[in-house]
Structures are given as structure tokens and as C-alpha cells.
Amino acid sequence: MEQIFSKLEFITSGEGFIDITNNLNLFIEKNNFDSGILNLTSLHTSCSLTINENADPNVLKDLREYMQSIVPYNSYLTLSKSREEISYKHYQEGADDMPAHI
């Protein structure tokens, strides 16, 4: 099977969701692919790739609220029965990077 490697870059302005479906479709169309496997990798630790439906905007609201509840900006709750709140120990890269690394 033929393989092609390419780099797609996306500029962001901080926390949020970016729909890259059209970018991927254009990449596939530009390269005249009929079939194959598309493997996506993020080279930045503060980024995640997810697959979600895009019909209901409340899905992204729910996902954002859920992520903020399990990995908040300033501290997190332990998974023990006591649910102790613990501050992050790594902070050198700024408040927005602390939860992003978890």
C-alpha cells in the first residue's frame, strides 16, 4: 500500500474546539484518495484529538463543562472517597497549561 506523509497546521487562540473535517476532506480530495487510512497525530501535549458528531452545539458545551469539571484550572479533586482538592505542582508554563497536561 502506498503511504503519504503530510503536515497540516492549525492556528488556535487558546482553549476551544476546532472542527477540522473540511480541512481533512480537502486534503483527501487534493490527493485523489479513493480509499485508505488517515492517521492523525498531535505534536503538542496541550492538544487532544476527538471524534464527535457536530449536529447539536450542546455536545461541545457538555464536553467543555465535563472537561473543566474533571481537570479544572487551579486544582483537582482526588479520586478517593474524601475527594480532597489538590493544587497542581507544575505551574511554570502558566495556568492554562496545567490542566492541559493532565
Protein language model annotation of sequence segments:
Residues 1-102:
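Active-site histidine-anchored catalytic micro-motif
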